[in-house]
Design a protein with these regions (language model features):
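Short Gly/Thr/Asp-enriched flexible loops that form oxyanion-binding sites at enzyme active sites
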Residues: 125-138, 142
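Positively charged, low-complexity intrinsically disordered leader regions
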Residues: 1-18
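Short, glycine-rich nucleotide/cofactor-binding loops
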Residues: 8, 26-40
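A glycine-rich helix N-cap at a beta->alpha junction
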Residues: 69-96
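Conserved small/polar residues in nucleotide/adenosyl-binding loops
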Residues: 160-164
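Histidine-anchored nucleotide/phosphate-binding helix
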Residues: 38-49
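Residues at the starts of beta-strands that form the adenosine-phosphate
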Residues: 2, 53-57, 80
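Glycine-rich phosphate-binding loop signature in dinucleotide/nucleotide-binding domains
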Residues: 107-113
Length: 164
C-alpha cells in the first residue's frame, strides 16, 4: 500500500504581495511555500505511514524550482517526490492540472489498496477542484473535506465532520 499526496507550491501571501497591472499575482517576485492545506494532507499521510508502514509519495506539477518543495517534504518523512514539469504546463487551469497530475500518477502506478490525498484547496486559487478531478480521471472513489483519517485494522477510514 502507498499513499500518494498531491501538493502545490504557492506564493507566500503572508508577506508583501506583488500584483501585475492586470490584477494578477506577480509570482516571479514572490517567495513560495507549500500550500498549507496540502501540508495537512502530507501530515495525515505521514501519520498513516507511521501506523501502517506504507510508502508516501508526493506529486506536484510546477516549474523546476518546485523540486525544493519536494525535498522539504522528503525531509519531513515523505519517501519519494515526483515533479511533473514542462514549460507548456505554465498557466494551466484546474482541469488541465488535474489531467496532467492524474496521468503522472497513472504512469507511476496505482494499486487497488492505494490512497490519494489532496489538500482542501490552494490559497492562490481557492477552487478546491484538482483533488476531486484527479480522482474522477483515475476512476477512484473520493471523499472531500475529510476531517479525520483513522484505521480499522489495516484499512484507512475517513470521517467527514459536517457543521451547520
Amino acid at each position: 500500500m502507498k499513499i500518494i499526496v498531491s501538493v502545490k507550491q504557492v506564493p507566500d501571501t503572508s508577506g508583501k504581495v506583488a500584483v501585475n497591472p492586470d490584477g494578477t499575482l506577480n509570482r516571479a517576485s514572490m517567495q513560495t511555500i507549500i500550500n498549507p492545506d496540502d501540508l495537512n494532507a502530507v501530515e495525515a499521510a505521514l501519520a498513516l505511514k507511521d501506523e501502517l508502514g506504507c510508502k508516501v509519495v508526493a506529486f506536484t506539477m510546477g516549474p523546476p524550482p518546485a523540486e525544493g518543495m519536494l525535498r522539504e517534504l522528503m525531509a519531513m518523512g515523505v519517501d519519494e517526490g515526483v515533479l511533473i514539469t514542462a514549460r507548456e504546463f505554465g498557466g494551466s487551469d484546474t482541469y488541465a492540472t488535474s489531467q496532467i497530475i492524474a496521468a503522472g500518477i497513472d504512469t507511476y502506478g496505482v494499486d487497488e489498496d492505494d490512497i490519494i490525498l489532496a489538500g482542501r484547496q490552494a490559497i492562490d486559487g481557492d477552487t478546491a477542484q484538482v483533488g476531486p478531478q484527479i480522482a474522477e480521471k483515475l476512476h477512484l472513489p473520493q471523499i472531500t473535506y475529510a476531517g479525520e483519517i483513522t484505521k480499522d485494522g489495516n484499512t484507512p477510514v475517513s470521517y467527514t465532520h459536517l457543521r451547520a
